[in-house]
Amino acid sequence: MLLSDVYATQKTNLFKNRSWAATDKQYIGFMLFIHGLCLAAPFTFSWPMVGLFLVSYFITGCLGITLSYHRQLSHRSFATPKWLEYALAYCGVLAIQGEPMEWVSSHRYHHLHTDTPLDPHSPYEGFWWSHMGWLLDNKVSS
């Protein structure tokens, strides 16, 4: 049927009027602390630190999340020796986006229900929810 996958849903205000689990509060507090440290960056700037940031981003974001969590573990796009699979997965853990099994199961569930009301990081809940808010909610990510 034409346009059968179009949904009309109302935002559920997942951030307001809810009880936050202790793990959610701890994660949010930690993220606020880390981002608060960034306020010191203009006063402590150095080019070696920019280089360290770029290397850290490559290790955690590119190798850990994109290559390991997403391509290797979620989609099984390629295989590596177990020692390398574990090393790459550890790089993903350093990105502070959760444990590999948790991230992979959430991502696979997302692909089962992409852009529907059942999507754990649905765009129907808004830009911030679909990009990062779902990470702050233990009920959605587990």
Regions found by a protein language model. Give the residues of each.
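Non-catalytic, topology-defining segments of multipass membrane proteins
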Residues: 1-142
